[in-house]
Amino acid sequence: MTIDRKESRKKRIQRVLPEARVVADPFHGLQDAGRRMDEARRVERRTGHRLPRWPLLKNEADLTERQAKELATIRQHFRNVAQFHWVKEQLRDVYRATSPEEAKAILDRILFEAEGASDAALVPWGRTLKRWKNEILADHPGGHRTATPRACTRRSNG
């Protein structure tokens, strides 16, 4: 079953359907990554720095030349925001991985970096990803989804 990363839903599914394979929904995972990264950007804005939003949220391959330059500046001058952006992009790569081994290697690298992060908000995010590691890795080539995220949410809430 594909679900968002809510512990209560995961526990309920495991209790009601113990044989069900729980998969962390990639859409919700990347949405959460974007939200966390944008919060790090807003923290910097509160200190008086103006950081553009789109270079951080867009897929790097889709950036305009100007946005790519803005992203390079952010990476150079705003370490915490750059760390959140790196994790977000690496998480995208987990879902783009062509093999389970590649996905696991990328996720392990994320977990290692998050564990030693200088930003206090990045450490608990890393712990959340670690708790959901198996469910995140369950969704990539070679795996399968049993239903759409919305359908699973309706069923698990019903």
What do the predicted segments below correspond to?
Residues 24:
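Short loop/edge segments at beta-strand edges and connector loops
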Residues 2-19, 27-31, 47-158:
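Acidic/histidine-rich catalytic cores and adjacent linkers
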Residues 34-45:
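Short, surface-exposed amphipathic charged segments that create phosphate/polyanion-binding patches used
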